[in-house]
Amino acid sequence: MKNYSFTFDIPQLRKLKKIYKSFLIEKEINNNSIYFFLKKDNIQMIAYNNGTFFIKGENIQEEILNIKEILNIKDYSAIGSDEVGTGDVFGSIVVCSSYVSAENIPFLENLNIKDSKKLTDEKIIQLVPKIINKITYSLISINPYKYNILTNKGFNLNKIKAILHNDMILKNLIKIKKNVNVILDKFTSSKNYFNYLKNEKKVYKKIFFCNKAEKVHISVAAASIIARYAFLKNIFALSKKIGINLKLGASTEVDKQINFIYKKYGMNILKKIAKCNFKNITKQFIKN
């Protein structure tokens, strides 16, 4: 069982009590020093009148970050990791792990990086050159040709992502030479994530798995737009190479483009520019 403690003022404790009111356990309080006690799933939290807030349980990482989000506690350094390209037929899968120090958070907030999911591709192309010299990041891009080799060997998308995230997190930790919170935008359960990594020589395990992680810490938002920037550059390069402006996503318009490319260049070219296990391709050209 893991545990963690905060020190809060009374207004902060009141806010937490209000947010967690459905989990309060009033009948178990028999100590005058306790302000409130609650149970949420397998996690216990105790707030003391002196401001100490104690949390314990097996999987407390996400709850710790949730509390920081509730109280708008953002002034801590962290590594955030995110990926792009996983929903696009064309182009690479890009994973980025970015370290944002507490000192650089205001700079990124002023650029509205925290709203990364709302940024247009045009805005991302403008912003990324402004931030890449302010933060430490590690990035890897798996092109479609290599992706297709891996999937043919039995790797599923989540396993590929887990391996890439683990590698980039480890690489970034070596660069910054310090221990900080590591936050990953959750794409599978922690159990599955580490199971995908069971054959890796080195695995980083102190990870906070969070839904909508870019809202938890701006380092994830930074990783997201840097990865998107690299992905877009890859799409532009592939488009230039074959003389076609490749479409993003996996829509019916993409289906039409796949069919056109197949008729003009054949499957060998598709294998180099597209993720061939996507239904957009398998339903047209690969029969069971």
UniProtKB/Swiss-Prot annotation:
SUPFAM superfamilies: Ribonuclease H-like. The keyword Hydrolase applies. Its EC number is 3.1.26.4. Manganese or magnesium. Binds 1 divalent metal ion per monomer in the absence of substrate. May bind a second metal ion after substrate binding. It comes from the Bacteria. GO terms for biological process: DNA replication, removal of RNA primer; mismatch repair. Its cofactor is Mn(2+); Mg(2+). It catalyses: Endonucleolytic cleavage to 5'-phosphomonoester. A divalent metal cation binds at residues 82-83, 185. It is found in: Cytoplasm. GO terms for molecular function: magnesium ion binding; RNA binding; RNA-DNA hybrid ribonuclease activity. Pfam families: RNase_HII. Residues 76-288 form the RNase H type-2 domain. The keyword Cytoplasm applies. It is an enzyme of class 3 (hydrolase). InterPro entries: RNase_HII/HIII, RNase_HII/HIII_dom, RNase_HIII, RNaseH-like_sf, RNaseH_sf, TBP_dom_sf. Transmembrane segments: none annotated. One of its GO terms (cellular component) is ribonuclease H2 complex. Coiled coil: none annotated. Keywords: Cytoplasm, Endonuclease, Hydrolase, Magnesium, Metal-binding, Nuclease. Endonuclease that specifically degrades the RNA of RNA-DNA hybrids. Belongs to the RNase HII family. RnhC subfamily. NCBIfam families: rnhC. This is Ribonuclease HIII. It comes from Phytoplasma mali (strain AT). The gene is rnhC.
